[in-house]
Amino acid sequence: MSQVMGVLNVTPDSFSDGGEHLAVEAAVARGLEMAEQGAAVVDVGGESTRPGARPVDPAEEQARVLPVIEALADRLGDRVRLSIDTRHDSTARAAVAAGATLVNDVSASLWPVAADLGVGWVAMHMFGDPRTMQDEPRYDDVVDDVRRFLVERAGAAVAAGVAEVWVDPGIGFGKTTVHNMELLAHLDVLVGEGFPVLVGTSRKRFLGELLARSDAGQAPYGPAVVAAPAPAVDPVPVTDRVDGSLTTAMWAMIHGARMVRVHDVDVTVQGVAVLSGSIPAPEDPLRSPA
């Protein structure tokens, strides 16, 4: 059965919930709520990686996340895993010392840290960095380019001794809406490489664009639209993207994703419960290829 990772942004500027959980008490309360709703993992992040986001100094990042991770580790024990969403070596190490057991790495570069500390590691694909990643991202073949990058990084992690390696195609990270849809449509290509796949589509801009196109009576994205784009429309607000988020999370799980990263844990857990009755669970969802 697929797992649900709950997003806990301890930031002032995240695209979906920036500022909502900046206070330690609010962040801890939200983490406990997601655990109660059925999240298998609570992913704590202290640096926004939305398009155009400013870099955050690791010391500032750690000041945001470490008290939250420590409090959640104390309250949750082994019932729910804690993950650190970071691209900084020092933050990953400090978070693991505070209780995190998974490094969710948007830079796909921290496998030596995971190997050293004996924790799990997620390699995510990103074109460029958050400041520039949406500046006309281009690929020869987005599905194959992402696959090759992630397989190379995951292979390096396995060779270094990381026992638990996940791969994430990085939906929305240096990709157009068409790129995102192609990656979802061909998720089986990445799943077929044998590493457990994590997918995060929750509340992202491409969903807002798709929903706005539908509301405006425009055709869905496809070859004809790419060749002759319809007039641009403003994406629907973040708060109106829950249904689209759930739909794409269900699609990802049906097509082999072992974990989905979401803001709306409660409805996603319900979706997992429905799917679990009809889709056999893998024998070992954390298996890495030999």
Which role does the model predict for each range below?
Residues 170:
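Conserved Motif II region of HX4D acyltransferases
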Residues 3-5, 164, 196:
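Structural motif
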Residues 2-6, 32-46:
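N-terminal glycine-rich anion-binding loops that anchor highly charged ligand groups
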Residues 1-2, 7, 13, 153:
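Proteins enriched for Cys/Gly/acidic motifs involved in redox and nucleic-acid/cofactor modification
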